[in-house]
């Protein structure tokens, strides 16, 4: 039997080491803007990419009090931070944002950065709450969509 421990002990939302099942659940239930960002913005298949991330084992998933998986996140080499979410974040929006901040604040990297599809309003709002600064717009991916570096 595998016992999972919270990486961060939040009051309502559990942040746990990723499992293959959680990665598949997130990929199957992505917010529409997150799916669009992965597919149109990066030219990638969310299921393939999230399963690959789970197999690498360096990311976490967020589990809300009603048992739903709200998303998964990770930090890759060089401080590249990412998060993809399901609609479960809307069931506990304030708590989710606070726990996401605790996750970001717990990281040891000197710098966390990435790019975000400028159409992804939920993530832009969350990134601002998390304390990231928006640096510049760039064209990115196979469709040369407008992304914002943070």
Residue locations for each model-derived region?
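Conserved acyl-CoA
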Residues: 98-112, 121, 130-132
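Active-site rim helix/loop that mediates acceptor-substrate recognition in acyltransferases
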Residues: 38-58
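A short, internal acetyl-CoA/4′-phosphopantetheine-binding micro-motif in the GNAT/acyltransferase core
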Residues: 82-98
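Short amphipathic alpha-helix that is part of the acyltransferase structural core
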Residues: 2-44
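Conserved beta-strand-loop-alpha-helix junction that forms the acyl-donor binding cleft
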Residues: 112-128, 139-143
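N-terminal secretory/targeting leader peptides
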Residues: 4, 134-135
């Amino acid at each position: 039997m595998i016992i999972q421990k919270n990486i961060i002990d939040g009051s309502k939302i559990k942040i746990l080491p990723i499992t293959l099942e959680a990665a598949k659940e997130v990929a199957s239930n992505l917010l529409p803007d997150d799916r669009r960002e992965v597919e149109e913005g990066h030219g990638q298949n969310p299921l393939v990419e999230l399963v690959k991330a789970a197999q690498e084992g360096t990311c976490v998933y967020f589990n809300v009090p009603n048992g739903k998986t709200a998303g998964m996140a990770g930090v890759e080499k060089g401080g590249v931070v990412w998060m993809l979410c399901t609609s479960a974040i809307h069931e506990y929006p304030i708590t989710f944002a606070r726990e996401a901040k605790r996750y970001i604040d717990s990281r040891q990297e000197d710098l966390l950065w990435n790019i975000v599809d400028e159409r992804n309003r939920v993530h832009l709002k969350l990134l601002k709450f998390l304390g990231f600064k928006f640096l510049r717009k760039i064209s990115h991916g196979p469709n040369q969509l407008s992304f914002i570096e943070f």
